[in-house]
Amino acid sequence: MTAVEPRPVPQLEATRPYPARTGPKGSFLYKMVTTTDPKVLGTMYLVTAMSFFMIGGLMALLMRGELARPGLQFLSPEQFNQLFTMHGTIMLLFYATAIVFGFANIILPLQIGAPDVAFPRLNAFSYWLYAFGATMATAGFITPGGAADFGWTAYVPLTDILHSPGVGTDLWILGLAVSGLGTILGGVNMLTTVVCLRAPGMTMFRMPIFTWNIAVTSVLVLLAFPLLTAALFGLAYDRHLGGHIYDPATGGILLYQHLFWFFGHPEVYIIALPFFGIVSEIFPVFSRKPIFGYTTLVYATLGIAALSIAVWAHHMYATGAVLLPYFSFMTFLIAVPTGVKFFNWIGTMWRGQLTFESPMLWSLGFLVTFLFGGLSGVILASPPLDFHVTDSYFVVAHFHYVLFGTIVFATFAGIYFWFPKITGRMVDERLAKWHFWATFVGFHTTFLVQHWLGAEGMPRRYADYLPSDGFTTLNTISTIGAFVLGASMLPFIWNIFKSYRYGEVVTVDDPWGYGNSLEWATTCPPPRHNFYELPRIRSERPAFELHYPHMIERMRAEAHVGWGSGKHGTPQDDDALLAKK
């Protein structure tokens, strides 16, 4: 018998959408530090912002643990002050604002058919300014006097050298100035990219709603953030150079409030409008319908942006120094374009073929939660009602319903929606739905009861209360909900790790099947410069037309925006125009 050499058995290897290694060992960190690829920078924004979200969430759990029962449990009033100051700062400026630029860097160039952003190196510089500024402000916790402890609004005279002598205050001021500069430069970059780098055929009214919202947000950034920077430099000048810019004797306290809130209210829409754009991308895909009222959505976005810079002093009703009828009327008015958006989102789903994958669930959670927050906002817009609940937990509940409802729900909707495009792998739908329901139940348990706490008179920012105040039961319920909310992040973290390493590999351009915008017309993940070839752009749905060419004539015939409406000519006119270019 002759021995036969055994045939080699092929070794099983995990398939990966990326090569196992693209350079010498240890080069990953160098590439990350020196990259100008907007997709890599966007991922870095997302990871950094979500890390700060977790840190801010841990601070919230410490505060809720302290407030669960009357009496001081484990925090001193000074520590409590530091926690709510840094919690607000981190969540608004280091999580919400930053994650906007995470999504914008990854998705916006893809949606307009651009190979890169307008200023790639400035883009990288913006990220590192944000990262260093955020780290600087948070580093106050390791200084002898602790972190900033005057509330995230930093009202004067709480921030002067007499009342806040510690280094933590200076780190907070400088950290916000540095990260704010990064935000300003990011806004310049995104606006220039939208104006200058759109693909042939991509007119303004063929841009996706998300791109429109990022462009409008960038304009608001350029209006609002320089004012914050100026106000912060004024604080530093008063603290260390003996200035009297915010001297109470000359009305400096109200001057600071006007400066801060002229930044602060547009900031709310800077961190809301992009997430309106995210859900506007998701609803059509999972309703199997085009977006309802595309043009109206664009004008509603412009209306919200215009009104957002006209209502800043509704945060100052209690000062008695603002024109109540004007600011109340303008605040009521801002509900109109927001209501138009709700009408369009519901119209998009109306009689659609709905499927409830995780991005759609999170978007519906956004709708419900943001609606509640908007209704309590209408209450607060009325001065007679606002006077009774100002600086109470009613305001805390409203603020979290509006911002958590908008930002966090839409953040997770966007992450689950674009995760296949970013990584080339699908997420685990079962874990994503567990994550959604735990977050939804935990959030509403935490913050719904805080409306009643505020109506009963519990002030915000207090570290303690008396058993006789009658706040114990509702505070206990709120704390239980907060810990459910905190635990809901565990399936998310595991899902992202598991899906990135072992998730099902995406082999098609559009894993959801009904994508409309251009990011669904390139590979998952996209190449370095986004596209190997671009499809013709003849409407606001180029990817859908690419994948379903037999639907084009019907779409033209039924269009309200596009060639069928008679507003823009014919497809042949479009071809002739492209040939001239």
From Swiss-Prot:
Cu cation binds at H265, Y269, H314, H315. PROSITE patterns: COX1 (PS50855), COX1_CUB (PS00077). There is a cross-link at H265-Y269 (1'-histidyl-3'-tyrosine (His-Tyr)). CDD domains: Ubiquinol_Oxidase_I. Belongs to the heme-copper respiratory oxidase family. Binds 1 copper B ion per subunit. This is Probable cytochrome c oxidase subunit 1-alpha. GO terms for biological process: electron transport coupled proton transport; oxidative phosphorylation; respiratory electron transport chain. It comes from Nocardia farcinica (strain IFM 10152).
